[in-house]
């Protein structure tokens, strides 16, 4: 067994928010430092002066370059492009300085802005990219309704990315389905996200009449679809409640809740959770109404607590975790009535909830941090032994 202590650098935008990528990067960095004794650094571009949202080991160093790409989000398209190029130039310069200073064995990118130049930095480290999105969502426009020039620009940008991905020492996706979306790449493998380290696999009692949803308040998370489905559910099961937790702007969804005349005592929209695992033991069902989902970590978390799940069969994430009818339900995108029917099927059948919950517990055991962490260690060992 290879016991070499590698020096690892992660490049990711930020750690200050409660996003899935932030959580997974934090988990893996902690595990590599604490369990394998690796020298781990995380290089950020955003959130200067802001603490990590998730607990970070004292053994992990954080270097914030204070580039500020997030300042460009609300800028007009062409102004955004010009400012982006200036920030990108600065980012390349200071990241190159840090990589030569640290001299890591391995540099891991979450494939944001640094993918444009990471392979050109000749610091001697093996470059790995890990993608937390489907191919369709990678480098997509975030402007809502992009104009023709914006769509053309992002299409060109995605094509350019393929050349950069091909140069990586290894390109890691989270699911087999996501891996199949890149047939032109031969340097690709699949390693899923891990179940959070502090979640103990256990089973809830399935007695509460409570449904939960966890994720950002954003269009792609589909909470508008969920509220419309809940409108159907509430008519038949007024004694059940729905609690939604997430960061972001709740106002559009609060407005929709009012427009649909939903019972605000039974349908509640909350802010972000500092400790999400406290909610699962008091839930009998988790729903994931996302329009697109690269993985779906909350599905695994719910399963670890024996909570059955309902999700739209979107992207590559949910179908890699949910076996339809076994540990949850997959619903045809974006069938609101079908989503409501699957929720109600579980609400009215406690035995089915318990059976699916128990099956989910077994599924979650496949994703422990020990198992996933050792898959990463095996990859590191292979890359270093091969001198890639």
Predicted regions and their residues:
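A conserved mid-protein helix/loop that constitutes part of the nucleotide-sugar donor-binding site
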Residues: 19-27, 209, 213-232, 252, ...
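Conserved acidic donor-binding segment of nucleotide-sugar-dependent glycosyltransferases
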Residues: 323-325, 329-336, 344-351, 365
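Carbohydrate-associated surface elements
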Residues: 177, 194
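Short, structured helix-loop element that forms part of the nucleotide-activated donor/catalytic region
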Residues: 52-55, 243-264, 270, 352
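N-terminal strand-loop element at the rim of the active site
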Residues: 11-18, 31, 35-82, 181, ...
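Aromatic "clamp/platform" in nucleotide-sugar-dependent glycosyltransferases that forms part
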Residues: 272, 291
